[in-house]
A protein has these predicted regions:
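Alpha-helical solenoid repeat scaffolds
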Residues: 1-267
Length: 267
């Protein structure tokens, strides 16, 4: 294998024990250790779906959501657990079309009625989505915050009249994160779990947000150092202190290394 990981690396493992092992692995910040773990988690190896789901969950928790999405995209998802992870990574990466079309065709893959409304509104029948939402909402199927977010998603004009409560970082779901962004009330990723941080790498995010997101992900090995360096070099800081001091330091070092070394003997 290109990864250097044996094909049978993940076979014959107890998923519960694997979960315990992965939970005990710290976010070390040691590049060699983080790189080895990520290569192992991403390796194309044999193993059942439960083991795959455990690996994907570990990737999500480390903020490697695009890698987790790609890994699941190569699998034949047959369980609700596997599809829940696929939906989470799709929402976190913005790659929702394939996931939603699959859910619209195979609704047994999820019991998440809010996700079904979300997907039906985008890649199915908007009228059906609206009918399902109002029916389920009348029956009390959605918590108040989620009900408001889905209502705004179906009718953006309600955004100004429906106030949303503050976010609980440890209770925020990928669907709510996307719905809040769509309602014009995006959730800042500072202080949120790592899985939400890659959204700030988008070109539409401010430069400062991109740098801080790249730093958080780079610190646990979920973003290549070259991509962090690219963001440090992508502009000129107009302020000082904090992140801007780091930007200046990196840019000055880069300029120094780029200068030709003058050999005194040539003078």
């Amino acid at each position: 294998k290109i990864s250097g990981i044996p094909e049978n690396f993940w076979t014959d493992l107890d998923p519960r024990m694997l979960r315990q092992i992965l939970n005990s692995v710290p976010l070390s910040g040691l590049p060699a250790a983080d790189d080895l773990l990520l290569r192992a988690l991403l390796a194309e190896t044999l193993g059942d779906e439960t083991v795959l789901n455990t690996r994907v969950q570990a990737l999500i928790e480390r903020g490697a959501v695009q890698a987790a999405y790609s890994l699941l995209g190569q699998a034949q998802i047959q369980s609700q657990e596997g599809f829940a992870l696929f939906a989470e990574t799709a929402l976190l990466t913005g790659n929702v079309e394939r996931m939603c079309r699959q859910l619209n065709l195979s609704r047994h893959l999820s019991d998440n009625e809010a996700l079904k409304v979300y997907c039906q509104a985008r890649f199915g029948s908007w009228n059906t989505a609206e009918l399902n939402f109002f029916t389920l909402d009348t029956l009390g199927a959605f918590p108040p915050t989620l009900s408001s977010l889905l209502a705004v998603d179906l009718d953006p004009e309600l955004a100004d009249s429906l106030g949303l409560p503050n976010v609980e970082p440890n209770q925020l779901t990928a669907l709510e994160f996307q719905l809040r962004a769509g309602a014009g009330q995006p959730v800042p990723t500072q202080g949120l779990p790592l899985k939400f941080v890659p959204s700030d790498l988008s070109p539409s995010s401010g430069w400062k947000n991109q740098i801080e997101a790249a730093e958080r992900l780079g610190a646990v090995g979920s973003l290549p150092a070259a991509q962090l360096l690219e963001r440090y070099k992508s502009g000129q800081p107009s302020a000082s202190g904090g992140v801007w001091d780091r930007v200046n330091a990196v840019q000055n070092l880069d300029l120094t290394l780029a200068d030709p070394i003058i050999d005194p003997s040539d003078e």
